[in-house]
Amino acid sequence: MAWTLYLLGLYPQKQRKVQRELDEIFKDNPDREVTMDDLRRMKYLEACLKEAMRLFPPIPYIGRVLVEDIELDGVVIPKGVTCWISIFTLHRNEKYFHKPEEYIPERFLTEEFTSRHPFCYIPFSAGSKNCIGRF
């Protein structure tokens, strides 16, 4: 959350877009409680949060113990070895993210993103040992 606020502060045009989205959702009664329907309508705010977690993942790397031998680029890595996966590096891979060093929340609103490999964006890890608090 802190990185999202920081990035929105750096990019006032994105901050204004979030404000317009919230103004539209709460235009009839700005003092009311937030509902689940309201949260579902906050598409741009969600994209801003996801993009912040892409650039600054809450879990920068994860470790996994191999349960079987695997071969990568002709090298066999034996069962029992702990492999470390850099989520920070994965999220900045140009193969999956155009201009990976830039804060572009809109990338999460496109079909291009939804058609990407499911494990190219894993801010809370992935698989059976992922974070139970992810959204």
Located regions from the model:
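Amphipathic, well-packed alpha-helical segments that form the structural scaffold of globular domains
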Residues: 2, 19, 23, 49-57
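A structure-centric feature marking long, well-folded core domains of fungal metabolic enzymes
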Residues: 11-15, 59, 92-96, 127-130
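Conserved cytochrome P450 K-helix E-x-x-R motif and the immediately C-terminal K′/meander segment
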Residues: 33-75
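Conserved cytochrome P450 K-helix/beta-meander segment immediately N-terminal to the heme-binding cysteine loop
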Residues: 85-113
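Cytochrome P450 heme-thiolate "Cys pocket" and heme-binding signature region
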Residues: 111-135
